[in-house]
Regions:
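C-terminal segments that line or cap access tunnels to active or ligand-binding sites in enzymes
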Residues: 133-246
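A glycine-rich dinucleotide-binding beta-alpha-beta segment and adjacent secondary-structure elements
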Residues: 1-11, 227, 231-295
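Mid-domain catalytic core of redox enzymes
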Residues: 32, 62-180
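Active-site/ligand-binding neighborhood in enzyme catalytic cores
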Residues: 1-51, 58, 254-269
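A conserved FAD-binding loop/helix module that cradles the flavin
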Residues: 291-316
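Hydrophobic, well-ordered secondary-structure elements that form the walls
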Residues: 89, 128, 185, 229, ...
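Active-site-proximal substrate-binding core of FAD-dependent oxidoreductases
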Residues: 66, 314-319
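Beta-rich nucleic-acid/ligand-interaction surfaces
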Residues: 54, 59-73, 77, 245-256
Length: 319
């Protein structure tokens, strides 16, 4: 399937349900949002605040306190805050959760299963800001693959054979005109290419720049990707006003998973239960949700959130 980029499919492993849920959401709903997807985040924040929720940005959980019966009584942050609660829901990467909670809090078999999870591929993303009234708006996504073998194996490439695929998309024009002012191009990138910067960390608020060699690497990969895209869209290069890039390290530092994986962990049709997790954990009042324990994407995390909510309400006696 050309749409395998939506879930980083692997030929002998990926279950059919992953393909079905990923593609079906595009068939039954809008595949693009006027004014961008951040509207969903803004709406969720407003609704949460309307119901009295407090949201804390740039707040990293680093430890739990335990009371009787191995229940969590408090959550401690890197910023020095302590939050006390009777129920804890974690949406962070499940491997990171185990680091925070401690190995001793879980059964050895569960801990081993989590540590054995294999991440999906990560990506190199190229975000273009275009000059006005030059590049026509395309009301559809472009999925390009170098050959048939690349459809399910594009994350495995020789260093001099990059990229093997890409997805090209754009936001609808704000003024409803026929030209776009933005293009986003995604391609798989092997995290091993960034091994020399593995110990670095940088976000808008923390860390330090990764240095000139990293910038040169990103620029070279951006040009490699543009050269391939220009074979199909020869006018695109001349329409670029400026651009910025993201690598697997960018995704790692912002999303918080070990490799910057786009879609959580691989699902294996031959061992389907290895990557399936129920919301309950061995810690009585700790629940998990999100793409690292269920399906990825807006559909996947919504299904996971509803399931976690149902389990929490049932265990609390409300259902």
């Amino acid at each position: 399937s050309g749409a395998s980029f939506l879930y980083a499919g692997v030929t002998p492993q990926t279950p059919l349900y992953v393909h079905t849920l990923s593609v079906n959401s595009y068939i039954q709903s809008a595949y693009r949002l006027t004014k961008g997807g951040s509207q969903i985040t803004d709406l969720l924040i407003r609704e949460l605040q309307r119901y009295g929720a407090h949201l804390y940005r740039q707040t990293e959980v680093v430890a739990f306190s335990y009371g009787s019966e191995q229940q969590i009584t408090a959550v401690h942050t890197k910023q020095g805050q302590t939050f006390r609660a009777t129920h804890i829901i974690s949406a962070i990467d499940v491997k990171q959760l185990l680091q925070i909670a401690g190995k001793q809090a879980f059964k050895p078999s569960f801990y081993k299963r989590v540590q054995g999870l294999q991440p999906t591929a990560s990506a190199f993303s190229l975000h273009l800001v275009l000059k006005p009234n030059i590049f026509p708006y395309l009301p559809y996504n472009i999925y390009w693959f170098k050959d048939n073998d690349s459809v399910y194996n594009t994350a495995q490439y020789a260093t001099n054979d990059f990229p093997l695929s890409y997805m090209l998309s754009m936001n609808p024009p704000k003024d409803s005109r026929e030209y776009t002012d933005n293009v986003t191009i995604l391609t798989y990138m092997n995290a091993n290419e960034l091994q020399r910067w593995q110990n670095s960390f940088t976000t808008n608020t923390e860390g330090n720049p990764r240095g000139n060699q990293y910038e040169v690497f990103k620029q070279q990969r951006a040009m490699d990707l543009l050269d391939v895209v220009a074979q199909q869209f020869p006018t695109l290069k001349s329409a670029i006003a400026h651009y910025y890039t993201s690598t697997p390290l960018t995704y790692r530092d912002y999303i918080g998973n070990p490799t910057g994986a786009l879609y959580g962990y691989k699902k294996n049709a031959n061992h389907i239960m290895e990557s399936v997790f129920m919301p309950q954990t061995h810690i009585k009042n700790l629940y998990v949700t999100g793409q690292s324990v269920a399906m990825h994407g807006l559909v996947g995390v919504t299904i996971s959130a509803v399931l976690t909510y149902q389990i929490l309400m049932r265990s609390s006696g409300f259902l």
